[in-house]
Amino acid sequence: MVRSAIGVVVGVVAWVVGFWILAILLAQLWPDYAVHGRQWTREGVFTFTAPMACCNLVAWLLAEIGAGWVAGRIARRGGAVWVLAGLLGVYLAVVHFALYWSRFPWWYDLGVVIPAVPAGTTTPTLYHHGKRGQ
């Protein structure tokens, strides 16, 4: 139980850190992305172009997969991965569907929220540990 809780907490941290690392890397490779990223972090204004926003969607997806993997490795139980995926899904749904729907393009809101739970549970750790009963 303790390992599961630690796995979920570390998974959330991995999710945030993973996205920011990918975003910083993208900003280093694409200077115009960096300009829009700074505008988002300073003013909360979403000015990313469609290709930039699609790169954000890929970064969120990769961060969710990585977070699920980290949580599964630490917890050694598939249940922790599902809890993490559920928490991320609920958090993103509240942020993108209730609080900030009008701040983002509709397709971006859907692109962030819909794959959150499936992406977080696609980690091989979930299936390997679940089959062995560990």
Locate predicted features:
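Juxtamembrane/disordered regions of integral membrane proteins
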Residues: 1-134
